[in-house]
Regions:
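Surface-exposed, interaction-prone regions used to assemble/regulate multi-protein complexes
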Residues: 1-133
Length: 133
């Protein structure tokens, strides 16, 4: 499971279903605040990278256990504590096409979901938000 796992408008990643979240970080463009990459670490697994580009959703895993924050051009925000995600269980991660762009949904067994999506009407293009189901 090393490398790019998905590059499509739709995918369903079942490998992490039922596992608890250890960490969720985002790489942010400091110029516009847009989310570039979501880093998800689930129990017993390496870090998974999720991102959107040109209307397509991507999922990668490079068998890394730490987020490389050496790039000073970007900001790395840890949302684990801010959104109280540590220990919450993943029930599904999937990408779907919405308005000719992909979005990635992270469903949690605790009745919450995280959504990585594209919004062309804002100053920044890519957002992540936490919602109740």
């Amino acid at each position: 499971m090393i490398g790019r796992m998905y590059q499509d408008t739709h995918f369903n990643l079942t490998l992490l279903n039922g596992l608890s979240i250890e960490q969720l970080k985002v790489c942010v463009n400091p110029d516009d605040g847009g989310v570039l990459i979501v880093y998800l670490k689930a129990e017993g697994q390496p870090i998974f990278h999720f991102f959107l580009d040109v209307g397509i959703a991507f999922c990668e895993c490079w068998n890394e256990y730490e987020v490389d924050e050496d790039d000073d051009d970007y900001r790395f925000d840890d949302l684990t504590e801010v959104w109280q995600l540590k220990g919450k269980h993943i029930s599904a991660i999937f990408a779907q096409e919405v308005a000719r762009n992909s979005e990635i949904t992270f469903l949690l067994e605790e009745g919450e979901k995280l959504l990585l999506y594209y919004c062309p009407t804002e100053d920044k293009s890519y957002f992540i938000k936490k919602l109740k189901q």
